[in-house]
Amino acid sequence: MPDRPAQSITRRDILNGVPLAIGGAVAGGLWPGLVGPGLAADAALQDAAGYYPPALTGLRGSHPGAFEAAHRLRDGDFWSRAGVTKQTGETYDLIVVGAGISGLAAAHFWRQRHGGARILVLDNHDDFGGHAKRNEFTLGGRLELINGGTLLIDSPKPYSAVADGLLKTLGIDPVALSEKCWRRDFYSSLGLRHGIFLDKETFSADHLVVVADGTSWAERLASSPLSPQAQADIARIEEAHIDYMPGLTSDEKKRRLAKMSYRDFLLNVAKADPGVVAFYQARTHGEWGVGIDAVAALEVWAFRFPGFQGLDLKPGAAPGQGVTAAGYAGDGGSYTFHFPDGNASIARLLVRDLIPDAVPGANAEDVVAARIDYAKLDRAASPVRLRLNSTAVGARNVGAAASAKEVEVAYTRGGEVYSAGASACVLACWNMIIPYLCPDLPESQKQALRYGVKTPLIYANVALRNWRAFKALGVSQVYAPGAYFSSASLNFVVDIGGYASPRSPDEPMLIRLVRTPCQPGLPERDQNRAGQHDILNTSFETFEHNIRDQLGRILKPGGFDAANDITAITVNRWPHGYAYEYNPLFDPDWPDGQAPNVIGRARFGRIAIANSDAGAAAYTDSAIDQAYRAVQELA
């Protein structure tokens, strides 16, 4: 199969090779070589004609130019190479570092309390939204959307009054929108089901298992390359009601399951053939970012993984569960809704709220197809300014933290360093950079901020000329436990605000592939570190090769030709992806108030911290709740 397309794919890294950055700071002199006014904000990159990041393909997410300055700051050699710091002369009521949902929500909450406050929001990426990015494609003359990061409105627990209130203020009613716009049963109405792709490198031969209704697991696996014993054990684990822990109460079983991995449960409790492990290994990737070796059995029980149906476990959360499993096992989770661009629409609605002239439209439905005017995001006359391509490199209280009345923030943009000032600062960036931005923090707080290691992941979005092969094979999504990407699925079908998803297999379609580059056998935080290194050292060409190879092998029996049927690729790489959630297998059970995320988010003078890391929960409601807390601490 050809590695390259018959026609070249449009892909480009925005201003490849040009250092891009974030930031702002106060008049003063806390950074080397501070000089007079030097920032021509109206001549900035984001004001250039045709500037529109959502439509870019190639490497997105943490794109080239978004992280290099922060890495130099981490490595201790930024300031020695930075040159003079230029004073912008700008002073604000609030500077927010990070234009993700948490940062934008912080700006929103601040203006709720302080009317016409002047706010500067800085972000190191070329687009706002943080992880809540969107990818736009024009296919067959029609706009097609897909999430580049945060997938949907969803949480293990009901949204708080604060988070729910923000959604309602923005005009988002998830329940009503879900009923009106989200066609969840569309693919099943066509007879499409889940598939499982067994790759030859892991299972000795390429084979697609279709999980068809009305068939047993023995029937589904009969022609697969799995050994007869592995087939029999998978069928037993999926279907049999066996108590593998006889003589124990439900609570006793739960306590034991909380301290063993699902892998150990399968091998040592259910006594499954070792070949079964590979079949289930990646099933936890999408939720936890690591395999079944690093996720407790009690965690996956909450997600109805097989093997527990005969244990007679009482419903409900249990001690020892992480935030995700405990939430779903207890409250059952929040309402859910998927915008066509994931939660990027929430970020766009927040920007409309803060800078109305930049985002046309009037409601939560029409924002989906709206085209942002990026040139209006950073205007001197606007009370709220959003400055992209600007990497914060310093945030310090002016004077002693206990008595400080203002803050200085420094940032790098276009190879220069600038400073601006404010009465307060919210750091809505990732926890791991904060000790380097605020070197004056107490050492114990710095250590707490460094504790969590964000989960790395890849969302690769691929444009297809049509999706006939999926229809021919009878699948809408495919789990691939041994492959480079652990899943591939057709885009969700959502019709909203004049935007309509494709319906015919003959029409162009977007599909998403997910990769979590974990390293089985290591503790989760070490797996995350290894995965971060893997992602940042993988070229677009390598991602593209694996996309073409894997889709070709899965879909070729349905008539798919990777060389001609793939028309565009966008790879969203997130080396610092999901917020770290404490893992019962590896992390202690801290007393109330002593967990690293709680210690790490403490206010420091006129600087407060807001992000999903601060909540130790990789969900949008956590990002919103932490933004509200940070603003309350500074108000």
Which stretches of residues belong to each language-model region?
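N-terminal secretory signal peptides
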Residues: M1-T10, P37-L39
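Conserved flavin/dinucleotide-binding core of flavoenzymes
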Residues: A44-G83, E136, K200-T202, T412, ...
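Glycine-rich active-site loop/strand segments that organize a redox cofactor
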Residues: D47-A48, Y52-A55, G130-A161, F305-Y328
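N-terminal Rossmann-like FAD-binding beta1-loop-alpha1 element of flavoenzymes
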Residues: D93-L120
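Glycine-rich FAD pyrophosphate-binding loop
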Residues: R111-N135
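Dinucleotide-binding Rossmann-like beta1-alpha1 core, especially the glycine-rich loop
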Residues: G140-Q231
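Active-site/ligand-binding neighborhood in enzyme catalytic cores
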Residues: E238-S390, A401
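Mid-domain catalytic core of redox enzymes
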Residues: A380, V384, L388-R512, T516, ...
